[in-house]
Amino acid sequence: GHRVFVVSWRNPDESLADKTWDDYIEHAAIRAIREVQAISGQDQIDTLGFCVGGTILATALAVLAARGEQPAASLTLLTTLLDFSSTGVLDLFIDEPAVQLREVTIGEQSPQGPGLLKGKELATTFSFLRPNDLVWNYVVGNYLKGETPPPFDLLYWNGDSTNLPGPFYCWYLRHTYLQNELKIPGKLTVCGEKLDLGAIKAPVYLYASREDHIVPWKGAYASTRVFKGKKRFMLGASGHIAGVINPPAAKKRSHWVNDKLPASADEWFTTAKEVPGSWWTDWAAWLKPHGGPMIAAPKTPGTRKYKAIEAAPGRYVKAKA
């Protein structure tokens, strides 16, 4: 097995409304890497990022690469965009006037000072990316017919949104979705360092879901051109969450495998082989050589210096937006 450390995505309140993209990279992602190195006693660790978490993780590793550090033994990116050339329906919500409006209302340019993007607004935006399934279905069933929606773990996830600090959100919108600068070596400066994702030397495993409405799989495939080292692309069935959370024991869905990485996503798919079942087994086989020798599992979490604070999953996970 693998010793796993999970970083909670904190739901910020007004006291954190001024936090920037640099803050999230330096004081969240990079600090988490440092602490895992210290607790595990390892110079290199396997790293994984999901969606925007993957964008943050890749940015952090590029910052560290600029400082002469390569802390990742491997990098796994799940439904992550680094090249924002193909962002799907989200393009309808993001243009120059829309980003400017955010910058002067909740960003660093706001006369009232930075504010929060409310989680409810974020959740509504994502729901309207799939209105038939996530909006009108419940208008008819719940409002018109008085039916109670059945318990559903993915629906719970969809409703469990988070606030975001305005400056962080505005930087992300402008430099990724609007201007697509993250993929360009040396174009952006983060935490005082010129970014070059190609400087990350770790082997990369990129996963995308075929029916993903948030991160279109062809957009995720474009990230294969960003990295210069060894990389593997995996396409799974279903959507943004259901495609990722697909344990092998369930024997559900399928995935597509292709050892080659042609320039075109369509060409990759045309020559790919469909394999029944979960993609997890492929990833586990890929990850195993990067994990180092087997050791005895720790009996308790943390160390003398880094003591456990409370039982998992921790208070941040339970906070409501």
Regions found by a protein language model. Give the residues of each.
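Short beta-strand/loop motif that positions the catalytic acidic residue
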Residues: 200, 206-208, 212
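Acidic catalytic loop of the alpha/beta-hydrolase fold
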Residues: 211-215, 240-241
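Catalytic active-site module of serine/aspartate enzymes centered on a nucleophile-bearing elbow/loop
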Residues: 232-321
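Alpha/beta-hydrolase-fold enzymes
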Residues: 38, 42, 56, 60-169, ...
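Conserved alpha/beta-hydrolase
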Residues: 2-14
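Alpha/beta-hydrolase active-site loop
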Residues: 16-40, 56
